[in-house]
C-alpha cells in the first residue's frame, strides 16, 4: 500500500494560522500520513524590502509546527539554484519516494492560477491537487481537483505584513513572538 503525503507549498512570509488549519484539515479529511511544508524562494519580482529571509521563514515554520510529529519542512526549493518549479520538485520527490502518493494542497487563489503553472498537464498526472476554498476566487479549472471543506478565512500573509501591529490573532503565539523579537515587517 502506498503512503499518502500532503505538500503545502508557499512563501510562508509569515506562516499563519490559516496555513496550519489547511494542513490539519487536509490531513484529517484525506487520511494523509504527514504534511510537508515546502517553503519556496521569493521570486525576484516579488521581493519587497522588509520581507523575511529564507532562514527566518524556515525558523517561523519550525516554530509553527513544533510538537506536531506528522508535520515536517522540506527546504529543497530554497536550496535550488535558478528558477524552482513545482514540476521539478515533484519529479524529484516521486523519484526519491516511488511508494508515495503526493497530495499538493493549494488555496483558492492558486486553484485559479493553476492553468498557468509550468508543465501543468504533466503535473496533474504526477500529484493529486487539493483545493481549499478561499473567498472571492473561482475554483473551477479544467483539471481534477479534490476539494476540502474548511471554514473560509480571509487571512493572508500579505495582509498580515501590511498590518503587522494588529496581526497577533492570526499567528501562532511563537511565530508572533519571533516576529517581535527579530523586528520583522516593521514590528518594533
From Swiss-Prot:
Keywords: ATP-binding, NAD, Nucleotide-binding, Nucleotidyltransferase, Pyridine nucleotide biosynthesis, Transferase. InterPro entries: Cyt_trans-like (IPR004821), NadD/NMNAT (IPR005248), Rossmann-like_a/b/a_fold (IPR014729). It is an enzyme of class 2 (transferase). The keyword ATP-binding applies. GO terms for molecular function: ATP binding; nicotinate-nucleotide adenylyltransferase activity. It comes from the Bacteria. The keyword NAD applies. Pathway: Cofactor biosynthesis; NAD(+) biosynthesis; deamido-NAD(+) from nicotinate D-ribonucleotide: step 1/1. Its EC number is 2.7.7.18. GO terms for biological process: NAD biosynthetic process. It catalyses: nicotinate beta-D-ribonucleotide + ATP + H(+) = deamido-NAD(+) + diphosphate. Catalyzes the reversible adenylation of nicotinate mononucleotide (NaMN) to nicotinic acid adenine dinucleotide (NaAD). Belongs to the NadD family. This is Probable nicotinate-nucleotide adenylyltransferase. It comes from Listeria monocytogenes serotype 4b (strain CLIP80459). The lineage of its organism: Bacteria, Bacillati, Bacillota, Bacilli, Bacillales.
Amino acid at each position: 500500500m502506498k503512503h499518502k503525503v500532503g505538500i503545502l507549498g508557499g512563501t510562508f512570509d509569515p506562516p499563519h494560522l490559516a496555513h496550519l488549519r489547511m494542513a490539519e484539515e487536509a490531513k484529517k479529511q484525506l487520511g494523509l500520513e504527514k504534511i510537508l511544508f515546502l517553503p519556496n524562494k521569493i521570486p525576484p519580482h516579488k521581493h519587497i524590502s522588509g520581507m523575511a529571509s529564507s532562514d527566518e521563514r524556515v525558523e517561523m515554520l519550525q516554530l509553527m509546527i513544533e510538537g506536531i510529529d506528522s508535520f515536517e519542512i522540506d527546504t529543497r526549493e530554497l536550496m535550488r539554484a535558478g528558477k524552482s518549479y513545482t514540476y521539478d520538485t515533484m519529479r524529484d520527490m516521486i523519484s526519491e519516494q516511488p511508494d508515495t502518493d503526493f497530495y499538493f494542497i493549494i488555496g483558492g487563489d492558486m486553484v485559479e492560477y493553476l492553468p498557468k503553472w509550468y508543465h501543468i498537464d504533466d503535473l496533474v498526472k504526477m500529484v493529486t491537487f487539493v483545493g481549499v476554498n478561499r473567498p472571492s476566487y473561482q475554483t473551477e479549472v479544467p483539471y481534477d481537483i479534490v476539494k476540502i471543506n474548511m471554514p473560509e478565512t480571509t487571512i493572508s500573509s500579505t495582509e498580515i505584513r501590511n498590518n503587522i501591529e494588529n496581526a497577533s490573532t492570526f499567528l501562532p503565539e511563537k511565530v508572533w513572538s519571533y516576529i517581535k523579537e527579530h523586528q520583522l515587517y516593521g514590528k518594533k
